[in-house]
A protein has these predicted regions:
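FNR-like FAD-binding dehydrogenase module
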Residues: 1-258
Length: 258
């Protein structure tokens, strides 16, 4: 993969969920699906078990009624030269305490050392420029993942004109990759760092506030050829950041950068 690419993860069902489904439908443990030569537990791991089931004559007929669980996409936080694929996953829960499909699988249901089924999706629109122009990385929450991959790639090329603008809730708990980011500052690999921790003061501060605070510097970087990368929540941050960039740079200039 390249910096900026996406991991499409295939979530699975927890052992408890599979066992409950089998008990409900009176399926004996370790029953073999003859056509697949695997156990029914293995066959059910990636199936949508919320499906309404019609009476089935055999396990093959049962499986024909079950669609696969949908995949979940995560920005990759590392580059191949690190020899590890890193994701940043926030565990999600609904109002009834049910864990999110992807986050529940990755943070709780999958066993340690268990292989994770995923494929890489090329994300060309977020790939790194192939020269040493400055870059401005803007993001919030788990969006730090995609930005970290870009910054890791830049540091390996000794490109130092990098600016990170990042927002989260609390510095104490939510400053992801703090030691790495601070080390980059110390070594000069990260020329600028602006942080917006919304819950650390009475008046909430977000990424778009930091952009407006640094409007003059932002315009200078863009005039010097900087490329802007934005990674984070579509609901909220993206529209606020877009509005701030239009206000600072003008709509025509921003369109040229897209």
């Amino acid at each position: 993969w390249q910096a900026g690419d996406i991991a499409e993860v295939q979530p699975g069902n927890s052992t408890a969920r599979i066992q409950a489904f089998m008990q409900k439908h009176h399926i004996a443990a370790q029953s073999i699906v003859e056509s697949l030569a695997i156990s029914i537990e293995q066959a059910l791991w990636d199936k949508n078990l919320n499906t309404e089931i019609e009476p089935f004559a055999n396990l093959e007929h049962l499986l024909e009624q079950l669609s696969p669980l949908p995949t979940r996409e995560y920005s990759i936080a590392s580059v191949p030269t690190q020899q590890v694929l890193r994701l940043v996953v926030r565990q999600q829960q609904d109002s009834e305490g049910e864990l999110g499909l992807g986050s529940g699988w990755l943070t709780q249901h999958a066993e340690l050392q268990q292989p994770i089924a995923l494929r890489i999706r090329t994300n060309e629109s977020f790939h790194l420029i192939n020269d040493n122009r400055p870059i401005i990385c803007i993001g919030n929450g788990t969006g730090i993942a995609g930005l970290m991959s870009l910054l890791h790639a830049r540091t390996r090329l000794d490109y130092t004109q990098n600016w990170l603008i990042f927002g989260e809730r609390q510095r104490e708990h939510d400053f992801f990759y703090q030691s790495t980011i601070e080390a980059w500052q110390t070594t000069g690999m990260l020329q600028r760092l602006d942080l917006a921790f919304s819950r650390d003061q009475a008046e909430k501060v977000y990424v778009h506030h930091k952009l407006r605070e640094q409007a003059t510097e932002l315009k200078t970087w863009v005039e010097n050829g900087a490329v802007i990368y934005v990674c984070g929540s579509i609901n909220g941050m993206a529209s606020d950041v877009d509005a701030a960039l239009i206000e600072i740079l003008g709509e025509e200039k921003l369109d040229q950068l897209r």
